[in-house]
Amino acid sequence: MKKLVIALGGNALQEAGKPATAQAQLEVVEKTSEYIADIVERGYEVIVAHGNGPQVGRIVIQNEVASASTPAMPFDVCGAMSQGMIGYHIQQGLSKVLRHRGINKNVVTIVTQVVVDKDDPKFKAPSKPIGPFYTEEEAKAIAEEKGYTMKEDAGRGWRRVVASPLPVEIV
């Protein structure tokens, strides 16, 4: 069986201009799953990889807001939470579409871990946009208040950026 890797960006998992709810993300994933199912029908074993910028950023914000009531999780745990959520939605959406087409295939999620070099220079130059978009004024206020690095993101607004070191190994 031929294998095909499909990469979905985190921004591709949400519809521009719509609320970033779990239900809205699931609806986008279900639409995307129609295309993935077409590929499965052509005889491919499909591996779906995905980004998580908007999702992990929102999870971090949720943790910050709730931190007065419950301890906030560290960033790596928030990343794993976003992987689990996105994988869960892909499992739900793709399984539903495959089932409706009479295709009996298992869909599984794997939460990955990577090893990075603690001396990677990218730790000193944050570049991965996460979370929602802000106006320039909002971004400056957030940077001042929280000490975050904020950058303009492709003409769409300003976002927090975090370090994105190169993986040395996948665990």
At which residue positions do the language-model features occur?
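Generic detector of intrinsically disordered, low-complexity, polar/charged segments
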Residues: I6-A7, V48-H50, E144, E152-A154
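Aromatic-residue detector
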Residues: I47-P54, I59-Q62, Y134, G157-S164
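Generic secondary-structure boundary/loop-capping signal
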Residues: V5, G10, G53, A72-P74, ...
